[in-house]
Amino acid sequence: MKIGILALQGDVEEHRYALEKAAAELGLSVKVVEVKNAQDLADISTLILTGGESTTIGKLAKAKGLEDNIKKATLPILATCAGLIYLAKEAVDRRVGKTRQSLLGLLDVSVVRNAFGRQRESFQTELEVRGFGKVNAVFIRAPAVVKIGPSVEPLASLRHVDYGEVYAAVRQGSVLATAFHPELTTTAFHKWLIREAKR
C-alpha cells in the first residue's frame, strides 16, 4: 500500500512518522511516498495534505501541475491545519478578509485562516472527536471551520470568542480534515487513512 504526503512545505516528517507508527500498530506495511509533482500521484492509495502555510502550498501545487491532478484523483484524503484550508471551498483570513489563494474546493466548508491568532496564541486542549474519542489536540496558527455544507459531518467543535461554535474536525465521505495537528499526539487519524486505503 502506497500513501502519499504532499511534500511541498510543512510537517512532512511528522506525518511520515505517524503513518509508519500507525501501520505498525495495525500490523501492516505501508510505503510512504513524498508527492512533489504530478507523477508522484500515480499508484498511491491515499493522500495527506500537511500543515504549513496554505498560500505557499497552493502556489507550489499549481506551479508543479499537482492541483488539477489532485482534484481528478478522488483519493481518500487526510488534511491537517493548512491542508484543511487548501482543501476547502472557501477561505478568508481573520485579519485581511477575502484572499485570492488557490483552493482545491474538494471539501464543502468555509474556513477562517489564523482564526485562533498567530504563533504565540497556539494552544493544546482535549477534544472529543466523533469516531476517535478523546484527542489531545494541538492548534498552531490554526484555522476554524465556520460553515459546513449538507454533505459534511462535523466531528469536533469548540467555542471561539468571535465566531461562536466552530468545527475543529470534519468529514465528507472519504475526506477527513482537522484544524489541529493529530500527527503530533496520536496515530488514530492515520489509522483511519490506512483503513480507507484498504477499502
Curated annotation (Swiss-Prot):
Coiled coil: none annotated. InterPro entries: Class_I_gatase-like, PdxT/SNO. Pathway: Cofactor biosynthesis; pyridoxal 5'-phosphate biosynthesis. The keyword Hydrolase applies. In the presence of PdxS, forms a dodecamer of heterodimers. Only shows activity in the heterodimer. It comes from the Archaea. NCBIfam families: PLP_synth_Pdx2 (TIGR03800). One of its GO terms (cellular component) is glutaminase complex. Catalyzes the hydrolysis of glutamine to glutamate and ammonia as part of the biosynthesis of pyridoxal 5'-phosphate. The resulting ammonia molecule is channeled to the active site of PdxS. It catalyses: aldehydo-D-ribose 5-phosphate + D-glyceraldehyde 3-phosphate + L-glutamine = pyridoxal 5'-phosphate + L-glutamate + phosphate + 3 H2O + H(+); L-glutamine + H2O = L-glutamate + NH4(+). The active site is at 81 (nucleophile), 181 (charge relay system), 183 (charge relay system). The lineage of its organism: Archaea, Thermoproteota, Thermoprotei, Thermoproteales, Thermoproteaceae. The keyword Hydrolase applies. GO terms for biological process: glutamine catabolic process; pyridoxal phosphate biosynthetic process; pyridoxine metabolic process. It comes from Pyrobaculum calidifontis (strain DSM 21063 / JCM 11548 / VA1). This is Pyridoxal 5'-phosphate synthase subunit PdxT.
